[in-house]
UniProtKB/Swiss-Prot annotation:
Tissue expr: Expressed in a variety of adult and fetal tissues.
Function: Ca(2+) sensor involved in Ca(2+)-dependent exocytosis of secretory and synaptic vesicles through Ca(2+) and phospholipid binding to the C2 domain. Ca(2+) induces binding of the C2-domains to phospholipid membranes and to assembled SNARE-complexes; both actions contribute to triggering exocytosis. SYT7 binds Ca(2+) with high affinity and slow kinetics compared to other synaptotagmins. Involved in Ca(2+)-triggered lysosomal exocytosis, a major component of the plasma membrane repair.
Residues that bind Ca(2+) 2: D166, D225, D227, D233
Swiss-Prot/TrEMBL domain comment: The C2 domains bind Ca(2+) and membranes. Binding to membranes involves Ca(2+)-dependent phospholipid binding. Compared to other members of the family, the C2 domains of SYT7 dock and insert into cellular membranes in response to intracellular Ca(2+) concentrations that are lower than those required for other synaptotagmins. The two C2 domains bind independently to planar membranes, without interdomain cooperativity. Moreover, SYT7 C2 domains insert more deeply into membranes compared to other synaptotagmins.
Primary location: membrane
CDD domains: C2A_Synaptotagmin-7, C2B_Synaptotagmin-7
Protein topology in the membrane: Single-pass membrane protein
Protein name: Synaptotagmin-7
GO annotation (BP), single: regulation of phagocytosis
Domain C2 as annotated: residue spans: 135-255, 266-399
The organism's taxonomic lineage, starting at the top: Eukaryota, Metazoa, Chordata, Craniata, Vertebrata
Length: 403
């Protein structure tokens, strides 16, 4: 009798089972890998998309180097800079950084109502407009119109009491000048290195500009802290509708700087306490909680944690960090960190608090920072002085996160 050898083989069924099991295992492995890649791509694309809404992708124009600069408006309406500086070259592309654009574009829509006729300010007379949460300093400038030459003149004179943006306790300020709603063309002052009370005394001319068009514009000044290695930090802004200014002669103004409308104010706040023990030569930093943190992920949330750096004479000494709070824009940390700081080194010490968004598959994102020292911004300096004035007592204070 003839028998099929395959049917008679007792090992055949077991080989089929093994083959099917291997196929299923490989399929599941490929599926897991593909899901992981899709999640990573969605997270990266979400962050890039959000960042593209906040920053301009084109480099800044070269930094100004002359005492008088001009934008000439020919018949075609295209603005060109007609005042190159002899013997000087523009900054390299590597020194140019993008700025938040919503600070300019959002402002166009917010200044169409509640306009009052403006009168020149003086050193003593600048009124404090509204209740500002933080002193950002003030700026002095003048503006006027030459009817014979159809030229608007803007002179940036000086600023006072600017906040420190660098951990060294100072800033490198410069000013951008726009005539809104035109956001494409701008002029800039020089950068004043390490100066919280800079003097510019630079004059800017908008030439070939008919008066009937000038009065339809808004003069917008944005003060920024120049940063060679990252995005320039907004310090504050001033805006004046030119139809509310007597332009027949140069008018000089002192104006308080207001927070820039660039989204930096929506980064959230952090509550922390400082406790100074002079006998133990130590400071205890307690990271308590945060609120209204900026969402950094595509799902509208963040995975925040906090880094604490101890700096001495602008050099990093020691780092501590909290645990990561998953998908939480109002996290509660309640973590304390002790740092050894001799009393004689206290004046040269800075504590940098950085709130980060954790990302497993790419670089972690900075949500915002706080610089604590005796020479930081007004709110930070107050906290630092209160800590020293009340030794061995935890002194808690809310801080606005900054870019």
């Amino acid at each position: 009798m003839y028998r099929d050898p395959e049917a008679a083989s007792p090992g055949a069924p077991s080989r089929d089972v093994l083959l099917v099991s291997a196929i299923i295992t490989v399929s599941l492995s490929v599926t897991v890998v593909l899901c992981g890649l899709c999640h990573w791509c969605q997270r990266k694309l979400g962050k890039r998309y959000k960042n593209s809404l906040e920053t301009v992708g084109t480099p800044d124009s070269g930094r100004g180097r002359s005492e008088k600069k001009a934008i000439k408006l020919p018949a075609g309406g295209k603005a060109v800079n007609t005042a190159p500086v002899p013997g000087q070259t523009p900054h390299d592309e590597s020194d140019r950084r993008t700025e938040p654009r919503s600070s300019v574009s959002d402002l166009v829509n917010s200044l169409t109502s509640e306009m009052l006729m403006l009168s020149p300010g003086s050193e003593e007379d600048e009124a404090h407009e509204g209740c500002s949460r933080e002193n950002l300093g003030r700026i002095q400038f003048s503006v006027g119109y030459n009817f014979q030459e159809s030229t608007l003149t803007v002179k940036i004179m000086k600023a006072q009491e600017l906040p420190a943006k660098d951990f060294s306790g100072t800033s490198d300020p410069f000013v951008k000048i726009y005539l809104l709603p035109d956001k494409k063309h701008k002029l800039e002052t020089k950068v004043k290195r390490k100066n919280l009370n800079p003097h510019w005394n630079e004059t800017f001319l908008f030439e070939g500009f008919p008066y009937e068009k000038v009065v339809q514009r808004i003069l917008y000044l944005q003060v920024l802290d120049y940063d060679r290695f990252s995005r320039n930090d907004p310090i504050g802004e001033v805006s004046i509708p030119l139809n509310k200014v007597d332009l027949t002669q140069m008018q000089t103004f002192w104006k308080d700087l207001k927070p820039c409308s660039d989204g930096s104010g929506s980064r959230g706040e952090l509550l922390l306490s400082l406790c100074y023990n002079p006998s133990a030569n130590s400071i205890i930093v307690n990271i308590i909680k945060a609120r209204n943190l900026k969402a950094m992920d595509i799902g509208g949330t963040s995975d925040p944690y906090v880094k604490v750096w101890l700096m001495y004479k602008d050099k990093r000494v020691e780092k501590k960090k909290t645990v990561t709070m998953k998908r939480n824009l109002n996290p509660i940390f309640n973590e304390s960190f002790a740092f050894d700081i001799p009393t004689e080194k206290l004046r040269e010490t800075t504590i940098i608090i950085t709130v980060m968004d954790k990302d497993k598959l790419s670089r972690n994102d900075v949500i915002g920072k706080i610089y604590l020292s005796w020479k930081s911004g007004p709110g930070e300096v107050k906290h630092w002085k209160d800590m020293i004035a009340r030794p061995r007592q935890p002194v808690a204070q809310w801080h606005q996160l900054k870019a």
